Amino acid sequence: SRRQKQLIIMLDRGLSNREIADELGISEHTVKVHLWRLFRRLGVKSRTQAVHFARTHGMLNG
């Protein structure tokens, strides 16, 4: 989804949950829920794994 793409880009930039929440205008709890769903969708368990997956699968291009 568009939101998940935004999250991956922000994770790649090294932003914290609080920084992501501030930038998107949502609560930190909502960020955590989005990340949990993203990790589940990608089959990963961490921010680092999510960024690695995104880079390897061309999700950060364009």
Locate each region found by the language model.
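Recognition helix of helix-turn-helix DNA-binding domains
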Residues: G14-Q49
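Short helix-coil-helix linker/hinge
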Residues: S1-R3
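Terminal helix-turn-helix DNA-binding modules in bacterial transcription factors
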Residues: R18, R55-T56
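Short, locally clustered residues in the helix-turn-helix/winged-helix DNA-binding domain
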Residues: I9-R13, R55
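…primarily DNA-binding HTH/wHTH and HhH modules…
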Residues: H57-G62
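Pre-recognition alpha-helix immediately N-terminal to the DNA-recognition helix
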Residues: K5-I9, Q49
